[in-house]
Structures are given as C-alpha cells and as structure tokens.
Curated annotation (Swiss-Prot):
The keyword Metal-binding does not apply. PANTHER family: MEMBRANE TRANSPORTER PROTEIN HI_0806-RELATED. The keyword Zinc-finger does not apply. This is Probable membrane transporter protein HI_0902. Pfam families: TauE. It comes from Haemophilus influenzae (strain ATCC 51907 / DSM 11121 / KW20 / Rd). It is a multi-pass membrane protein. The lineage of its organism: Bacteria, Pseudomonadati, Pseudomonadota, Gammaproteobacteria, Pasteurellales. The chain crosses the membrane at residues 4-24, 28-48, 49-69, 81-101, 107-127, 147-167, 183-203, 210-230, 243-263.
Amino acid sequence: MFTFILLCLLVGALAGFLAGLFGIGGGLVIVPTLVYLLPIVDVPESLLMSTALGTSFATIVITGIGSAQRHHKLGNIVWQAVRILAPVIMLSVFICGLFIGRLDREISAKIFACLVVYLATKMVLSIKKDQVTTKSLTPLSSVIGGILIGMASSAAGIGGGGFIVPFLTARGINIKQAIGSSAFCGMLLGISGMFSFIVSGWGNPLMPEYSLGYIYLPAVLGITATSFFTSKLGASATAKLPVSTLKKGFALFLIVVAINMFLK
C-alpha cells in the first residue's frame, strides 16, 4: 500500500500540473496509470477500467477546484460561454457514466484509446493550419456540444478539456480563455462523473476495501494531495507561455498518451 500511495502522489503531481496548463482535468494521465497500478491493491481485471474512470473523475473534482480558482483570478473564464455548456455536460456525463460503468473492460479501454487518438489528431491539424472561425456560440450549439462532450468525457474519464478547448476556440474564444473555461467545466463535470460511477458500482462485492462504488478512495487521496497544488502552477504557466507553445504542448501530450494506450 505504501508503494501504491507513493506512486499516486507522483502521478498527482504530474496530472495536476497538466490539468492546470491544458484544462484537461488530468484524466488522460490518471486513467492509463491507474490501470497499471490498481492490480497492486487487488482490483480485479474486469473492473480495472471502471475503477480507473470513476477514481479519475473523483480526482478531477479536487484538481479542478485549484485550476478553476487560478484561472478565475487570471480572468480566463468566459461565463457567458459556460452558463449553458457546463450544466448540459454535467447531465450528459452522469447519464453516460451509468452505462460506461457496466461495459466490458476491453471495450471501454478501446473507446478510451480511440478518443485519445482523435484528440491528438485534432490538435496536430490545428497546429499545421490556423482555424478560421466561422461559427458562433449559440444556445443550441452549446446544448449539442455539451451532450457530445459529456458522452466522450464519460468514456475517457477526463475533464473534457480536449473537447471543450477546440469547441470554444472554433467559436471565437482565444485559447487561454478556452482553457480557463474548460477548467471550470471540468470541475463540474468531475462532480457529475464521480456520482455516476459511485451509483453504477455501489455494493459491488469485488471492489477492495476503502472503495465507494467504482472509486478507490486511497488513490483519490494520494493523487489529489499533490495535484491540487501543482494544478495552480500549471494554470499560472498559461499566462507565461505563447499560444503556439500551448497548442504544440497539448498535441504532443495527447500523442504520447495515445501511443502508450496502443502499446499497452
């Protein structure tokens, strides 16, 4: 258990910084890492993805608080953009989480990997060619976008930054404000996803001690003990890095995760 907690502390430090920097909630680091670590504490193979996803959402809540708080101070949250998008995403994540929690591990793992590949490709293409804004952010687009973002985020156990950021930038919001708005949405998304996986895994006799549904509490504590603080460092870094560096860093990060998932 000591080794497990120590590893979770290290994962949390990295995930928190990336969450603040990219507005991703850290899930793209946390989920694949937990798939490797959870067998140490006797989580059965059939429940690895469900537990990794549920635990990731729980950590997103804590990490997202620190990240969103810092972005708010920097003035990076566009409240007009998130007032419809955030609640729609929350509802979508909760409903889809109930379904995802019951999927076979191999299926959910493949869905996760495919989503990561999509995100990586999306960011690489946006670097090669600047996107021309031809769409506006309307209530209808916010509802449709929120539903789709919630579905994808639920399957990937992420704060939705990889979907929210390009969605907002395509509608005229600059990338720093899109990242800040994504961090705020990610915090609320995490709350919804967390409760969804608690409900879907409630009373499962195969889960180890100190579990709450499909959430393994020691992992949550270990990861958030460091991620809460490093997320603020990552959020501060967005004010110092140029836009092109942010895009390249985001794309490179997603590509590395995608390769890792396919080699697993």
